[in-house]
Amino acid sequence: MIDRYKHQQLRIGLVSPQQISAWATKKIPNGEIVGEVTKPYTFHYKTNKPEKDGLFCERIFGPIKSGICACGNYRVIGDEKEDPKFCEQCGVEFVDSRIRRYQMGYIKLTCPVTHVWYLKRLPSYIANLLDKPLKELEGLVYCDFSFARPITKKPTFLRLRGSFEYEIQSWKYSIPLFFTTQGFDIFRNREISTGAGAIREQLADLDLRIIIENSLVEWKQLGEEGPTGNEWEDRKIVRRKDFLVRRMELAKHFIRTNIEPEWMVLCLLPVLPPELRPIIQVEGGKLMSSDINELYRRVIYRNNTLTDLLTTSRSTPGELVMCQEKLVQEAVDTLLDNGIRGQPMRDGHNKVYKSFSDVIEGKEGRFRETLLGKRVDYSGRSVIVVGPSLSLHRCGLPREIAIELFQTFVIRGLIRQHLASNIGVAKSQIREKKPIVWEILQEVMQGHPVLLNRAPTLHRLGIQSFQPILVEGRTICLHPLVCKGFNADFDGDQMAVHVPLSLEAQAEARLLMFSHMNLLSPAIGDPISVPTQDMLIGLYVLTSGTRRGICANRYNPCNRKNYKNERIYETNYKYMKEPFFCNSYDAIGAYRQKRINLDSPLWLRWQLDQRVIASREVPIEVHYESFGNYHEIYAHYLIVRSVKKETFCIYIRTTAGHISFYREIEEAIQGFSQACSYDT
């Protein structure tokens, strides 16, 4: 059983048959060793008790009820005076029934079987290590052809031919008949090898260090040859080099983790604890069983049949034995991963069996549904909304969430400031929501970052740290620029908030995970904090302005006349004189006082270089004043000159929205320049 205080991680890998036996076997007090499941039965149909040596055997997996054996005797658990510690009649130990959640069993396979994950999953680890085509290995595993066993240094009958099925098709039917003839069993066992046993022998003969050396030499030779000029040959060389790299990495991994390649072929099949594959009785007396039980029963049936063929009858045809070995291999494949070889196996109701892979993988699998993604302490969850007034590194937490997340810190603050005598009084003050509680909460939040996470976390920017502030409502406020890293938008997305507790976690959150420190994509280096969606629409509205030209006031409906030279008035048109401003602060102030609109044209005095003005550009109008000064009016700017043609000032034609956008960019550039100067 995994101790949660000693084990911080879980790794799935290959184990040796000895390790499987150590997990599954146990020695009961009378000296008998139990653990092997030999019968495909579950419960007796009359007594409704587990069958002995079956898939739910109490001798192997422990009692169904704590302290009660299969006979019905009761003993107090943990009482040293109680003797004996097990029932001598049925062999069941008097232990806690929770042992059935982690006590394993095993099935001793009559013939070796390959683990389908390492044979059929891509890339195929077995094919990579043996450097053979997957199709050839599948034919060998499923007894479609045989392999000559190199048992001596001298050539033998079949060693001259090797894997003969692919070379001479006429041998396809004659050779099996030859070897299945009565009296040739010794010769057959000496000369040929087929099934997963042949794969196991080849894997056991591998030297991983020699594989690495030979692969490296071949990779260097292919790299020195250079391009051949033939596109097809060049592609084959590239694929071969990639294969050699994968093969070397795989061999290094086996050496580093002390895993033997032959462990990919199973001799002992582990049996899951009964509580992980239960049989439940529902209303009406009907039983509901896990599909794993039916798949285990199929394996045991076929394995026992193969055992009977090999032990009870010496004259069993070899073809029948090979066919039964193939059935055992297919049964184990279905148990581990149903449907990986094509059409999945179904029950009587045409429903696909859920194999071990289906139980553990996917969103509804054991890991993601039961072990991962669960609620933890000091965490919350809510819908995100936009917070346009927030800084990039801040987020808004609702009061209801914040007081729950930081409740222990607030209690400590109340006790330290002698505002509460104990924890109970502090909790009552928090429930009453006294003003001092919010003051202490704000002090706590100022020195404590929080982590925001949006599922699915596909890269490291899926979880970032922020400085929290209190907001009203029940939603989390987020700066819109950080949405791209989370792949989030404000259409109802939810995010989880976590509080880092340890000093190491807080230091990591402050130094590495703050949102304003993750402005570039870690994958390609492009900016990731860029305006999207609502911000782009807002910037468009801010800088769009009116489409009215500079001559709109002159050629407007107020100046329209009919054929009788009479003025035509329109009540919907409002004459707007374009105002002049000396600086941007006056223009923004006028907008805030609602004297001008956001998109209303205005003239702003500007320090513009004369060289940017095209000398060939002709003014649209020239207005003269009484003292001789005049205004040259162009499409987007206006120049005030003296009598001596000296330039007094220049006005540009813009809007309050453009001015506001320009000021934001200018402040950002100045802040960035100051930050760079501090770093240098």
UniProtKB/Swiss-Prot annotation:
Positions binding Mg(2+) in this chain are 489, 491, 493
The record's Gene Ontology biological-process terms are:
DNA-templated transcription
* Record's function text: DNA-dependent RNA polymerase catalyzes the transcription of DNA into RNA using the four ribonucleoside triphosphates as substrates.
**Name this polypeptide is given:** DNA-directed RNA polymerase subunit beta'
Q: Which InterPro entries match?
A: DNA-dir_RpoC_beta_prime, RNA_pol_asu, RNA_pol_N, RNA_pol_Rpb1_1, RNA_pol_Rpb1_3_sf, RNA_pol_Rpb1_clamp_domain, RNApol_RpoC1
Question: Cellular component GO terms, alphabetically?
Answer: chloroplast; DNA-directed RNA polymerase complex; mitochondrion
Names of the cofactor(s): Mg(2+); Zn(2+)
Record's keyword annotation contains rRNA-binding: no
Can you name the source organism? Answer: Lobularia maritima (Sweet alyssum)
Higher taxonomy: Eukaryota, Viridiplantae, Streptophyta, Embryophyta, Tracheophyta
Recorded family membership? Belongs to the RNA polymerase beta' chain family. RpoC1 subfamily.
Q: Which reaction does it catalyse?
A: RNA(n) + a ribonucleoside 5'-triphosphate = RNA(n+1) + diphosphate
Q: Which domain of life is it from?
A: Eukaryota
Question: What is known about its subunit structure?
Answer: In plastids the minimal PEP RNA polymerase catalytic core is composed of four subunits: alpha, beta, beta', and beta''. When a (nuclear-encoded) sigma factor is associated with the core the holoenzyme is formed, which can initiate transcription.
Q: Which UniProt keywords apply?
A: Chloroplast, DNA-directed RNA polymerase, Magnesium, Metal-binding, Nucleotidyltransferase, Plastid, Transcription, Transferase, Zinc
Transcription: is it a keyword of this entry?
A: yes
Specify the enzyme's EC class, one word.
transferase
Q: Where in the cell is it found?
A: Plastid, Chloroplast
**E.C. number:** 2.7.7.6
Cofactor binding note from Swiss-Prot or TrEMBL: Binds 1 Mg(2+) ion per subunit.
Q: Molecular function terms in GO for this entry?
A: DNA binding; DNA-directed RNA polymerase activity; magnesium ion binding; zinc ion binding
Binding-site residues, Zn(2+): 69, 71, 87, 90
